[in-house]
Amino acid sequence: KAHAADGVTVREYKLKVNVHLQDPDSLVWTDMQKRGNIFSNTINLGQQKAVVLGDELFVYTSNSTAYKTSTAPDKYNWSKVNVSNLPSDVKLTSAVEYNNALYMVTESKRVFSSTNGGAWTEVTTLGDNVIVLINGFSDRLSGIVEINGKQYFNICKDGKNWEAENTADNLTLEEVPAGFPTENISTTQTNTGNGVEKVGRAGR
Protein backbone atom coordinates (compact mmCIF):
# COMPACT_ATOMS: atom_id res chain seq x y z
CA LYS A 1 0.00 0.00 0.00
CA ALA A 2 1.10 3.55 -0.73
CA HIS A 3 -0.06 6.36 1.57
CA ALA A 4 -0.28 9.95 0.32
CA ALA A 5 1.14 12.89 2.24
CA ASP A 6 -2.33 13.80 3.54
CA GLY A 7 -2.32 10.61 5.62
CA VAL A 8 -5.75 9.68 4.28
CA THR A 9 -5.44 8.72 0.64
CA VAL A 10 -4.26 5.14 0.13
CA ARG A 11 -3.56 3.24 -3.07
CA GLU A 12 -3.00 -0.49 -3.12
CA TYR A 13 -0.68 -2.13 -5.65
CA LYS A 14 -0.20 -5.77 -6.60
CA LEU A 15 3.34 -6.97 -7.18
CA LYS A 16 4.33 -9.77 -9.50
CA VAL A 17 7.73 -11.33 -8.80
CA ASN A 18 9.49 -13.19 -11.59
CA VAL A 19 12.25 -15.60 -10.61
CA HIS A 20 15.19 -16.10 -12.96
CA LEU A 21 15.43 -19.81 -13.70
CA GLN A 22 19.11 -19.70 -14.68
CA ASP A 23 21.68 -19.49 -11.91
CA PRO A 24 24.07 -16.77 -13.15
CA ASP A 25 26.94 -18.45 -11.31
CA SER A 26 26.48 -21.67 -13.25
CA LEU A 27 26.43 -20.38 -16.83
CA VAL A 28 28.19 -22.84 -19.11
CA TRP A 29 30.83 -21.47 -21.46
CA THR A 30 32.23 -23.28 -24.49
CA ASP A 31 35.79 -23.00 -25.81
CA MET A 32 34.99 -22.14 -29.42
CA GLN A 33 38.50 -23.08 -30.57
CA LYS A 34 37.32 -26.66 -30.18
CA ARG A 35 34.44 -25.96 -32.57
CA GLY A 36 36.48 -24.41 -35.38
CA ASN A 37 39.43 -22.24 -36.30
CA ILE A 38 40.17 -18.95 -34.56
CA PHE A 39 40.01 -15.88 -36.78
CA SER A 40 43.57 -14.66 -36.17
CA ASN A 41 46.71 -15.36 -34.16
CA THR A 42 47.74 -11.72 -34.40
CA ILE A 43 47.58 -9.66 -31.23
CA ASN A 44 45.73 -6.44 -32.01
CA LEU A 45 46.31 -3.62 -29.54
CA GLY A 46 44.24 -1.13 -31.52
CA GLN A 47 40.52 -0.67 -32.01
CA GLN A 48 38.28 -3.67 -32.63
CA LYS A 49 34.55 -4.03 -33.05
CA ALA A 50 32.22 -7.03 -33.28
CA VAL A 51 28.85 -6.50 -34.95
CA VAL A 52 26.15 -8.77 -36.37
CA LEU A 53 24.86 -8.36 -39.93
CA GLY A 54 22.13 -10.79 -40.92
CA ASP A 55 23.25 -14.26 -39.86
CA GLU A 56 26.96 -13.38 -39.74
CA LEU A 57 29.22 -11.98 -37.01
CA PHE A 58 31.90 -9.55 -38.19
CA VAL A 59 34.98 -8.53 -36.19
CA TYR A 60 36.75 -5.45 -37.56
CA THR A 61 40.43 -5.07 -36.66
CA SER A 62 41.42 -2.28 -39.07
CA ASN A 63 40.01 -0.18 -41.89
CA SER A 64 41.11 -2.88 -44.35
CA THR A 65 40.62 -6.15 -42.48
CA ALA A 66 37.75 -7.97 -40.82
CA TYR A 67 36.84 -11.55 -39.98
CA LYS A 68 33.44 -13.17 -40.13
CA THR A 69 31.66 -16.33 -39.05
CA SER A 70 28.11 -17.61 -39.09
CA THR A 71 26.08 -16.97 -35.95
CA ALA A 72 24.65 -20.50 -36.19
CA PRO A 73 26.36 -22.74 -33.58
CA ASP A 74 26.82 -25.60 -36.06
CA LYS A 75 28.39 -23.33 -38.72
CA TYR A 76 31.16 -21.74 -36.65
CA ASN A 77 34.08 -21.09 -39.02
CA TRP A 78 36.03 -17.84 -39.35
CA SER A 79 37.14 -16.42 -42.68
CA LYS A 80 39.03 -13.25 -43.54
CA VAL A 81 37.21 -10.34 -45.17
CA ASN A 82 39.07 -7.81 -47.30
CA VAL A 83 37.53 -4.45 -46.46
CA SER A 84 37.49 -1.75 -49.13
CA ASN A 85 36.94 2.03 -49.14
CA LEU A 86 36.98 2.60 -45.37
CA PRO A 87 39.21 5.64 -44.71
CA SER A 88 42.12 5.46 -42.30
CA ASP A 89 40.36 7.72 -39.79
CA VAL A 90 37.31 5.45 -39.43
CA LYS A 91 36.27 4.76 -35.85
CA LEU A 92 35.78 0.99 -35.76
CA THR A 93 34.02 1.16 -32.40
CA SER A 94 31.29 3.29 -33.97
CA ALA A 95 29.91 0.38 -36.05
CA VAL A 96 26.15 -0.22 -35.79
CA GLU A 97 23.65 -2.26 -37.81
CA TYR A 98 20.41 -0.88 -39.21
CA ASN A 99 18.01 -2.24 -41.83
CA ASN A 100 20.40 -4.94 -43.11
CA ALA A 101 23.38 -2.60 -43.44
CA LEU A 102 26.37 -1.62 -41.31
CA TYR A 103 27.33 1.98 -40.60
CA MET A 104 30.54 3.58 -39.26
CA VAL A 105 31.61 7.15 -38.51
CA THR A 106 35.02 8.69 -39.18
CA GLU A 107 37.07 11.17 -37.16
CA SER A 108 36.17 13.68 -39.88
CA LYS A 109 32.47 13.12 -38.98
CA ARG A 110 31.50 11.36 -42.21
CA VAL A 111 29.36 8.21 -42.41
CA PHE A 112 30.11 5.05 -44.41
CA SER A 113 27.81 2.07 -44.95
CA SER A 114 28.02 -1.50 -46.24
CA THR A 115 25.44 -4.15 -47.05
CA ASN A 116 27.92 -7.05 -47.09
CA GLY A 117 30.49 -6.02 -44.48
CA GLY A 118 33.32 -5.78 -47.02
CA ALA A 119 32.60 -3.05 -49.58
CA TRP A 120 31.88 0.35 -48.05
CA THR A 121 30.57 3.60 -49.53
CA GLU A 122 30.19 7.07 -48.07
CA VAL A 123 26.64 8.19 -47.26
CA THR A 124 27.16 11.80 -48.30
CA THR A 125 23.52 12.71 -47.69
CA LEU A 126 24.04 12.24 -43.94
CA GLY A 127 26.51 15.11 -44.00
CA ASP A 128 29.97 15.67 -42.57
CA ASN A 129 28.93 16.69 -39.07
CA VAL A 130 28.04 13.31 -37.53
CA ILE A 131 29.58 12.79 -34.10
CA VAL A 132 28.40 9.23 -33.50
CA LEU A 133 25.67 6.74 -34.41
CA ILE A 134 23.88 5.61 -31.27
CA ASN A 135 21.90 2.54 -32.28
CA GLY A 136 19.90 0.90 -35.03
CA PHE A 137 16.31 0.41 -33.86
CA SER A 138 13.65 -1.49 -35.81
CA ASP A 139 12.42 1.65 -37.56
CA ARG A 140 15.21 4.22 -37.25
CA LEU A 141 18.92 4.85 -36.96
CA SER A 142 19.69 7.27 -34.16
CA GLY A 143 22.75 9.48 -33.98
CA ILE A 144 24.28 12.73 -32.83
CA VAL A 145 25.03 15.60 -35.20
CA GLU A 146 26.96 18.80 -34.59
CA ILE A 147 25.37 22.10 -35.55
CA ASN A 148 26.98 25.47 -34.83
CA GLY A 149 29.32 23.92 -32.27
CA LYS A 150 26.56 22.13 -30.35
CA GLN A 151 25.53 18.47 -30.42
CA TYR A 152 21.97 17.30 -31.06
CA PHE A 153 20.14 13.97 -31.25
CA ASN A 154 18.74 13.10 -34.67
CA ILE A 155 17.17 10.07 -36.39
CA CYS A 156 17.33 8.59 -39.88
CA LYS A 157 14.69 6.20 -41.22
CA ASP A 158 15.82 5.54 -44.79
CA GLY A 159 19.53 5.10 -44.05
CA LYS A 160 20.33 8.15 -46.16
CA ASN A 161 18.72 11.28 -44.73
CA TRP A 162 18.21 12.75 -41.29
CA GLU A 163 14.59 13.39 -40.37
CA ALA A 164 15.48 16.91 -39.21
CA GLU A 165 17.60 19.04 -41.50
CA ASN A 166 21.15 19.84 -40.41
CA THR A 167 20.47 23.54 -40.17
CA ALA A 168 20.01 26.07 -37.42
CA ASP A 169 16.80 27.35 -39.03
CA ASN A 170 13.72 26.35 -37.03
CA LEU A 171 15.81 23.85 -35.08
CA THR A 172 13.69 21.47 -33.03
CA LEU A 173 16.30 18.85 -32.16
CA GLU A 174 17.08 17.89 -28.56
CA GLU A 175 20.52 18.97 -27.38
CA VAL A 176 22.81 16.22 -26.11
CA PRO A 177 23.41 16.46 -22.34
CA ALA A 178 26.92 16.91 -21.01
CA GLY A 179 28.75 13.66 -20.38
CA PHE A 180 26.75 11.58 -22.84
CA PRO A 181 29.12 8.84 -24.14
CA THR A 182 30.25 9.22 -27.76
CA GLU A 183 33.49 7.20 -27.89
CA ASN A 184 34.38 3.50 -27.44
CA ILE A 185 30.72 2.62 -27.38
CA SER A 186 28.97 -0.56 -26.26
CA THR A 187 25.18 -0.83 -26.47
CA THR A 188 22.57 -3.35 -25.40
CA GLN A 189 19.04 -3.20 -26.77
CA THR A 190 15.99 -4.62 -25.00
CA ASN A 191 12.22 -4.38 -25.26
CA THR A 192 9.98 -3.38 -22.38
CA GLY A 193 6.93 -5.41 -21.40
CA ASN A 194 4.74 -3.30 -23.68
CA GLY A 195 7.12 -3.58 -26.63
CA VAL A 196 8.99 -0.27 -26.38
CA GLU A 197 12.60 -0.51 -27.59
CA LYS A 198 15.21 0.69 -25.11
CA VAL A 199 18.98 0.79 -25.35
CA GLY A 200 21.63 0.81 -22.65
CA ARG A 201 24.85 2.57 -23.60
CA ALA A 202 28.34 2.65 -22.12
CA GLY A 203 31.42 4.50 -23.29
CA ARG A 204 33.20 7.76 -22.74
Task: For every predicted segment, state its role.
Residues 1-39:
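Beta-rich interaction/scaffold domains
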Residues 3-4, 43-58, 62-66, 97-99, ...:
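Active-site-adjacent structural elements in enzyme catalytic domains
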Residues 22-31, 73-80, 118-122, 160-164:
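Beta-strand initiation motifs
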Residues 29-37, 49-85:
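Beta-propeller domains
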Residues 37-52, 85-100, 124-144, 169-197:
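Repeated scaffold domains used in trafficking and secretory/extracellular systems
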Residues 62-74, 106-115, 140-163, 196-204:
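Structural motif
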Residues 75-107, 112-113, 120-124:
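Blade-loop segments of beta-propeller domains
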